[in-house]
């Protein structure tokens, strides 16, 4: 049983805010802090996710909750573990223009007295936990615990073109100890294999998907390179080094990287970011003339003995003729040392398999 969820690529939040003349003000009020997602969990009921890196494009798909079904657009996020959607209890402006779950309309809903709190780079979500049937593609997950938001402070969610988030990372980082959706799919024997795979299309193309329980052979014709996980928290792997052209620029003594579909850019430590933009000859804000793309060198990630190369066409984002690097600087170092986030800029170049049975990530080159 293999189940495909098509993903839509949303207009970037950066562009929507720019169109409304709100970008500068937004960035002042919400300084970008990607590190907040990956900081050690402060309390058992808190986990971090980078809502801000949904600044660029986001890929989202539809799920349904309840009986009869109520539909929601969610980001399938391999960098977090909770499922949550807005609820009718939410009076924040962000909830007013999104779909809201109404538990009184579902005959299968079971309430709890538990609360959930999730902090983001730009704000936080707090709410209550409940149980219901969650339909993902043709899979009905019974008794799935999920968050019903009561507050979504800040204007951030207001402009997002998705309603909630479905986390696909490990139970160990789930806020309030809530069992993640994929863990229930496995324990309820709803998938043929204990893995899922992700294809994210390039600019403007359709066809992105998450496939639960299988690998689509049409996307693995160039072979699959398997990388063992270094931790069962995020989908975390060890990188050997990073090169620009043939020059060794970062990750000198190996470093940790997280493969994160919920982060649109490629996030790296401050020192690495400074060295890379210097080597690329790009200004510190990452803006670049679109005419220069052809002159830029490849950036290569050496992982488990294999070179994974990003050409400039992959790491430079062109939005309506203005170009910027798809790299972001992590800012504060995490307790995990030098950490990288391989977001959508990286994932678009590979068909990625997230294998829970063997705790590995598989990467198959797409071009």
From Swiss-Prot:
Glycans are attached at residue 113. Its EC number is 3.4.23.1. It comes from the Eukaryota. GO terms for molecular function: aspartic-type endopeptidase activity. CDD domains: pepsin_A. Signal peptide: none annotated. Residues 1-42 form a propeptide. Keywords: Aspartyl protease, Digestion, Disulfide bond, Glycoprotein, Hydrolase, Protease, Zymogen. Disulfide bonds join 90-95, 251-255, 290-323. It holds the Pfam family Asp. GO terms for biological process: digestion; proteolysis. The active site is at 77, 260. Residues 59-364 form the Peptidase A1 domain. Belongs to the peptidase A1 family. Shows particularly broad specificity; although bonds involving phenylalanine and leucine are preferred, many others are also cleaved to some extent. This is Pepsin A. It comes from Gallus gallus. The lineage of its organism: Eukaryota, Metazoa, Chordata, Craniata, Vertebrata.
